[in-house]
């Protein structure tokens, strides 16, 4: 909320009141003076207030019409922006469809045919679609792209599966007795050639993808820097735009007000020119009333000067607004040029010693190829050697493990035969014990059924359920009566609080005297005093009538409250009596329930003992049955194991014969593999020498690259320092230009105001009628609210003793602008009070 100067209503200053009105200082916030006509009663005041409210509403309507036109322009701009967004979306959608087509063609070229899903629409078809159909086709396009990726991955997986099948096939061929090494070597060479071609393709793709990824990351960094700069700029422009909107809104409201005033003054001038001047009476009071109330008098020189001043102010505000818009456009252009230059400098520094130039050089590519080939050959030879050694060790370990297993299984069979004989003996003993226990269980069960009957238990349960339901109903009724008692006490407390609040409101009513009007001739002062005394008498009479009515209302309220309190007290006594009766009944019922509960608990204890004995007997029988089941299962398992051991003995004899044959084949393979290992070791030494040479070359290239990187970092640091200095200087220059421009504008406005003050001083002194009219106007302005200018003063601030209307203060309090418009002091709910002037 803006701070207001300590000024009176209509422009009078309480601190210092200079004699000349023309030499007054310009106020920070100036209430617009309203010329009110003569008033005979309160209804006339309200009628005039309605007239001024309609004028304010017309001004608001003009403002809203202009805002609607501006919003329509913004709507057109947003439509254009939406069209550009749709075109960008079309580009992205087509790019995704191109990716899908590329993946499909790759899968067809490498792995065969590709079975795709439903085709998604093109980007041109998507533009005219509704929201539902667009969502369906968008999901279809996503599914097609996902299917393309899945098919490509599946094809890769199938190829890897084929290679594993081929390796398994080789192993089976080597294990078979009819082993032909020439055929295996041919298949291996063919497979190695196909795998080498695939590896070359994959390596080229990997290098290409790595270079693309590096370029994309570099572009991403550049774009992120640009984005951060643009975001900062957008935030600054948003703040500037908000300030500009606030200024334009304020100027629009002023322009609407001035246009409405101009239109009203022109209409009054035309009506005055058409109708003749009315004759003035001899009395000064009648003349002033006619001047104020007559609408067909032509406008005076002061009104014409005010219109000219308003027009000049409007032109000044328009010129200032146009200048500031031009400044904003120039600043936007400067910022765009600076961002472009910054991005160019950044790109130049990054591309001067770029990694792409090193990576794309022929020497680097040749070194990379030789290095990759040497590493592949080294890995292949080392893998072959490891496979041969692992196979040899596996054969030896398998042979030893089989011999150990055969000896262990022979010992296990002997142990199992002994266990079977022991289990047979224990089984016969357990069966005899189970029959004895079953007979005992049947006898106990018959005795228990004779002692206890089911009908007695049912009767006991029914009586317990009825007693529980009665207890619940009594408790619910007790809770309901307590709630009723609490509600009656709350009503009594609320009525007492209302009584106290009404008494306090009656005591807080105040009357505030008004100050006398100074600096006026004695005849006018006497007349004004007579009018003032008559007005005060009427106000006192009205206040006394309202006080009597209020006292009558308060007495009636007290009677009603006392009557309600008596009714509530009688209800409370009846409720207390009923509560006592219910508590006595509840105690009797609880005693009966306790006696019944003890009897029920004794019966339950007896039943629990009988149940425990029954469960123990059942547990014994179950244990006997479980033991019998376990014995049957062990017999079946032993029979199965005997059959398995017989079959294993036959298979072990056959396996021993196979091992002798495999031993001979493995010895031949070991001799061949030892020869191949010697040849591969010679090749490996040669390749290691080549690798060391290439490694030295790569280290030299890396050192040169690091030096270039250090130089580039140093250049970037220098460039950033220069940019920061440039930005700081540019900001200082812009601030200085802005301050200078604002100072020039303020000087120009002060010059215009000084000329206007000189012109007003040259005007001759006003006539006696105008002086009296001005005094009458000031008197009426003292009685009107300075905030809304329409309603009379009927409320006072208890902190600062400033007067306003009650509606304005309530609106300020409700909108949380809880500060006095004159002295800017805070106020609360109890800091303002209604008065009668």
UniProtKB/Swiss-Prot annotation:
Top-rank taxon, per record: Eukaryota
Ranges for region Interaction with ubc-1: 1-313
ZnF region ranges: RING-type: 785-824
Segments for region (Disordered): 1-33, 269-302
Signal sequence annotation: none
EC number: 2.3.2.27
Protein name, entry field: E3 ubiquitin-protein ligase bre-1
């Amino acid at each position: 909320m803006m701070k207001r100067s300590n000024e009176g209503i209509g422009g009078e200053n309480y601190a210092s009141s200079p004699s000349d009105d023309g030499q007054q200082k310009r106020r920070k916030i100036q209430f617009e003076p309203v010329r009110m006509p003569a008033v005979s009663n309160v209804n006339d005041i309200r009628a005039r207030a309605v007239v001024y409210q309609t004028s304010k509403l017309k001004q608001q309507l003009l403002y809203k019409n202009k805002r609607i036109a501006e919003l329509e322009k913004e709507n057109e701009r947003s439509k254009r922006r939406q069209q550009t967004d749709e075109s960008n979306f079309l580009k992205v959608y087509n790019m995704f469809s191109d990716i899908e087509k590329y993946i499909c063609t790759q899968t067809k070229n490498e792995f065969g045919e590709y079975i795709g899903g439903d085709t998604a629409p093109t980007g041109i078809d998507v533009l005219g679609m509704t929201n539902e159909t667009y969502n369906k086709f968008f999901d279809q396009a996503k599914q097609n792209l996902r299917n393309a990726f899945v098919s490509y991955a599946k094809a890769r997986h199938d190829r890897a599966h084929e290679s594993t099948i081929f390796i398994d096939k080789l192993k089976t061929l080597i294990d078979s007795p009819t082993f032909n090494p020439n055929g295996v070597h041919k298949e291996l060479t063919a497979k190695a050639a196909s795998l080498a071609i695939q590896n070359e393709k994959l390596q080229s793709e990997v290098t290409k993808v790595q270079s693309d990824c590096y370029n994309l990351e570099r572009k991403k960094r550049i774009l992120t820097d640009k984005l951060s700069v643009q975001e900062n700029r957008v935030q600054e422009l948003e703040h500037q735009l908000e300030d500009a909107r606030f200024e334009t809104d304020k100027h629009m409201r002023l322009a609407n007000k001035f246009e409405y005033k101009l239109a009203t003054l022109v209409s009054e001038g035309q009506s005055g020119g058409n109708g003749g001047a009315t004759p003035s009476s001899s009395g000064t009071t009648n003349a002033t009333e006619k001047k104020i109330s007559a609408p067909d008098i032509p406008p005076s020189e002061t009104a014409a000067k005010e219109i000219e001043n308003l027009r000049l102010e409007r032109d000044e505000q328009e010129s200032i607004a146009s200048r500031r818009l031009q400044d904003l456009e120039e600043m936007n252009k400067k910022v765009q040029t600076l961002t472009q230059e910054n991005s160019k400098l950044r790109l130049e520094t990054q591309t001067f010693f770029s990694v792409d130039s090193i990576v794309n050089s022929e020497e680097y590519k040749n070194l990379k190829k030789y290095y990759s080939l040497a590493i592949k050959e080294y890995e292949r030879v080392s893998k072959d050697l490891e496979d041969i050694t692992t196979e040899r060790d596996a054969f030896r370990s398998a042979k030893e493990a089989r011999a150990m297993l055969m000896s262990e299984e022979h010992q296990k069979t002997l142990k199992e035969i002994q266990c079977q004989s022991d289990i047979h003996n224990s089984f016969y003993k357990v069966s005899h014990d189970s029959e004895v226990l079953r007979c005992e269980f049947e006898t106990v069960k018959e005795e228990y059924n004779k002692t206890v009957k089911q009908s007695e238990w049912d009767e006991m349960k029914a009586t317990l359920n009825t007693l529980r339901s009665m207890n619940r109903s009594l408790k619910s009724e007790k809770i309901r009566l307590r709630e009723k008692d609490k509600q009656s006490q709350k009503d009594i407390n609320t009525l007492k609080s209302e009584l106290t609040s009404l008494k306090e409101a009656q005591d807080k009513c105040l009357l505030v005297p008004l100050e006398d009007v100074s600096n006026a001739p004695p005849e006018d002062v006497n007349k004004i005093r007579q009018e003032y005394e008559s007005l005060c008498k009427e106000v006192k009479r009205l206040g006394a009538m309202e006080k009597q009515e209020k006292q009558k209302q308060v007495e009636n309220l007290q009677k009603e409250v006392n009557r309600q309190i008596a009714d509530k007290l009688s209800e409370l006594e009846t409720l207390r009596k009923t509560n006592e009766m219910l508590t006595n009944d509840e105690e009797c019922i609880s005693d009966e329930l306790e006696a019944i509960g003890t009897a029920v608990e004794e019966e339950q204890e007896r039943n629990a003992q009988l149940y425990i004995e029954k469960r123990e007997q059942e547990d014994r029988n179950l244990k006997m049955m479980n033991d019998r089941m376990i014995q049957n299962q062990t017999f079946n398992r032993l029979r199965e194991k005997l059959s398995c051991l017989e079959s294993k003995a036959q298979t072990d004899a056959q396996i021993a014969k196979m091992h002798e044959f495999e031993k001979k084949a493995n010895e031949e393979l070991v001799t061949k593999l030892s020869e191949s290992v010697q040849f591969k070791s010679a090749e490996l030494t040669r390749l290691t020498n080549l690798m060391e040479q290439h490694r030295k070359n790569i280290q030299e290239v890396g050192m040169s690259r690091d030096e270039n990187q250090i130089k580039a970092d140093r250049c970037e640091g220098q460039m950033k320092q220069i940019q920061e200095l440039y930005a700081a200087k540019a900001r200082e220059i812009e601030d200085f230009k802005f301050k200078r421009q604002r100072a020039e504008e303020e000087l120009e406005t002060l010059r215009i105001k000084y000329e206007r003050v000189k012109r007003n001083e040259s005007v001759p002194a006003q006539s006696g009628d105008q002086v009296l009219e001005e005094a009458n106007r000031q008197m009426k302005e003292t009685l009107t609210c300075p905030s809304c200018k329409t309603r009379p003063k009927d409320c006072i601030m208890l902190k600062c003793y400033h007067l306003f209307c009650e509606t304005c203060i309530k609106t300020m309090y409700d909108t949380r602008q809880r500060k006095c418009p004159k002295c800017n002091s805070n106020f609360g709910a109890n800091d303002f009070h209604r008065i009668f002037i």
